[in-house]
Amino acid sequence: MSARRRVPNKPAPKNAPRLHQPGQAVLKAILPEQIDWKPFPAFPPSARLAVVVGQPLQEGPYTIRVKVPGGVKLMPHRHPEDRVYTVISGIFYIGLGDKFDAEKLHAYPPGSVIILPGNTSHFHWAKSGEYITQVTAMGPLGLEYLSAKDDPRNNC
């Protein structure tokens, strides 16, 4: 008979980042029609971002959703934080590298989970139509394009 390891039932450290804040209801649910899609200055104008949980621009855990319409490319960029992408809908095309190269794209269908280490240069393309991904990470969220000409924040 194998010995069972017990998981200790200890409270989280008092200074641990929390998603559930004091004073919030015990359960919080967000229905698809309640997702608040907004433009995000670091994305192409037609792409949208929605904050699901947390405060991405501050330290601590966050979850966002990203919606990119068909044909739109996010040129090579990187994020300082490690990220976990979950494909919600559409086909998510992501490639690694400092230059956009369609040959390096990998296609991930809904339900796929992609783990991307921080500071990894990568690019996206909504090659076959709109996609939605959910991104979970520890903030603050950062996004740096490898070429200033690709950064939509410079085209204002």
Can you name each region flagged by the protein language model?
Residues 10-62, 148-156:
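A short, N-terminal "cap"/entry segment at the start of jelly-roll beta-barrel domains
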